[in-house]
Amino acid sequence: MIPKFLKKRIFKAPVATDHTASTPEFEAEMLPVASTLYANAPINQLYRKLSGQLLDVAVKPKLLGELPEFDDDDNILRFYVLQDYSRSNSILIDLQTQEHNLPPALVGVQDITHDVKENAAIIFLHHPHAKDSQLSPRLSRLVAAVLQHPELQVRLVPVSILWGRAPEKEDSLFKLLTADNWEDPSITKQLFNIGVMGRDTFVQFHPPQDLRTLIHDSLKGDGEGFSVFDSVASETNTVQNTAQADTANDANKVNDIAPSFAMVASADGNRELVRSLQQQLNIYLDKQRASMLGPDLSDRRNLVDKLVYSPAIKHAIEAEAAASGTSVREARMLAKGYANEMVNDYSHSIVRGFYKFLTWLWTQLYDGVEVHHFERVRELAADYELIYVPCHRSHVDYLLLSYVIYMRGLSIPYVAAGDNLDVPVLGPLLRGAVAFYIRRSFRGNALYTAVLREYMHTLITRNTPIEYFIEGGRSRSGRLLPPKMGMLAMTVHSQLRRTNKPVVFIPTYIGYERIMEGGTYVGELKGKPKESESLIGLLKVGRKIERIFGNVHLSFGTPLHLSDFMQKFDVPANSLPADRTDTPLDDKTSAMVDNIGVKVMQHINKAAVITPVSLLSLVLLSAPKAALDEDICREQIALYQGLAQHLPYSDDTIITDMTPQQIIDYGIKLKLIERIPHILGDIIQVAGKQAALLSYFRNNILHVFILLSFLSALVARNGRIERSRLNSIAEQLYPFLQSELFLYYSAHGLTETLNKKVDSLLASGLIVELSDGMLSVPETNSKCYQQLQVLATPVEQSLERYFMTLALLAQQGSGNLTENEVVDLCHLLGQRLSVLYADDIPDFFDRALFTSFIGALIRLDYLQKDEETGILIFDQRIDDIAHHAKYVLSPDMMQILQQVASLNEEEIAHAITEISNKNQRKFGRKRS
């Protein structure tokens, strides 16, 4: 039998309209504000202590987000705001405040000067024992005190408590006992929470809110949900006119400070104001909870049926039946099969299992997982439909990003994964956790496209966060791949069909210091067939767990709001029919989608993390034979760090804070480089056959230094060059570098950017400006001259690819090769060049780089593409571009490139035939 005193409420919440006069004991206190337990409540103290000890054993809460930051002013009153009254919640918050050295929650708050006397620092928005269950008595008293005393400062800290993080199941008979819900918790539910969910409990303190500011904004009618305050002014003015003279005088003083305040001396007089503030706080906490739990879940079978029988898919089924000559029933079964292929089957048990497994796995694989700028995501989560658009480096990306988001308290996103991952054992597990599967290619399959669009629309309208890799596949070179616009277009299509929340894209940079698939990537770039995913392949990867993989970095870039692009491109909202998926996007909207894709890639690059490994790779791969004297290596690393800090690529870019010596030691620890002892000074060189792998990490940050490298190369290769000439050449070739590396500098402001880069090089002593406006190299035997030569090297490989491509086009002539043939031939030539002259560096034969360059030539109108045949047509301007290469490349290298690109008709015909046969073997089997 439970003792009677254990059933007492934690505090007694009076609803009196006026404060009781302060007792002499309290007036005798020396401090105006004090936090003390009442001496006349020993049973409450005993109850709290005993309950706290029991709860501390049964419940192990996890703190989400950051702790609130409070001002040091002791005169500020601080209260924690919870939605529902609960003994367990109040004690849990008290334990958390004690553990994290926050102002205590279950300690009395007294302010004699302002007549505030509360026996706990917790405000319950819903209290079943209050006289008016719709109003919080404590909030009412605090509002009255703030209105009466202009100098009184009160901070409200909203707090979310989740007993379990399983999203609700629609139509579930056990939802009250299996997940956190939105109703007041009963005694039974509280006991169940403590006993079953105690180890899966989460607490998040939200940023403190100034009560006076909330009142001020409410009376002004600012912000979401403040329209309810429109009637407050007239009501409170009436109360003011009938109040006593001294109260009216106080009101006039308040109005002098804040004219929008209507002075009310009693708690009851502020009923509408308190009700509206309470509604505002409820809405805020509801949104925060939704951002952490996600939307209610529909049973997978029901969701598939809803998709198939939705008006949009019904129309698509009828169109498919008419086009294919099959029956509507057969077309419907086909659509249902497509839906079953892709629809996620979320299981919170699987998610929790993955969370525990991945927590162990990351400690085995990595020294740490470093996360940057996540606060941006948290600020948007409650009010926006989040679309995470990360770069794609590894299969680990799927799990890593979801893990970081879940660990920081937000709802886990649904991840669009290629159906190549839907393999036995692994496939169902991923489907139950984060993945919905889509085919790698479904061009021309109208019904599949319709089902996928409708599923995406369903997820977005249910406010489900989504994640997809805009590159379409994993980058094998470390550079960003050109964006694939399919999923992006579907997101825009859904927004224009009407959704509940505005869409915001979250560009996300993922950077590794070692990568599991590194060896496979190099082989695939060389032409080795791509290995299909399987359980055996997964087990092979598992064998690498004992290896050292360093740190992994996630950096969240500046969010991109879809509404901003719609305004820029004059795309009206709700411009597509809600019940159709086949309405095409018009030209303006398509142009907007393309622009969003490019901006996403640029923002991913802006958020890059310059890691120790990427810096080492950039330095050593630019040196002859990938080796440097250790002292010179340290100086070169320090130079690159200084350049990146003096003129940051972006405010979002993160630079390692390791010293150059620490960076070298770190690279040796990861077995990527090695130290060769020598009596004249130790040498640092790339270890074993790691050069090809290190090029991957160099390319992760190449965009940060590429313009500095380009300008250095122009000065270094010419000895002297006029500043105006340097700018002219750079402006001519910049569009190709921009296309390859997604540089964000605009063409019309490029001169200013170049001048800043040149000034940075001058300040570092790498180049010298002569009196006649000429830029010159430093003394040839100086340290700065050697550093300039190393810095000039990275851009050369890009320009060598450009020149080789242009040489091939010029030799074969206009109207003789298609775009695909040029890319294929350049890929083969790059492989040959890499083996003969470039230490087998994969940058020379990355097919995506040649595709990007040809695409840039077409976009800039240097090449014209025949719509029917795909044949490329060009004029002498191709030679003009190639002419600029001589300012950067040595004559010997230009001769080598021209020789490699010299192919006769027989060689070209043979190469094209072999490539065609290989592609037929690779793509001969297509899915229906």
Predicted regions and their residues:
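Membrane-interfacial terminal anchoring regions of lipid-handling membrane enzymes
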Residues: M1-E467, G472-S928
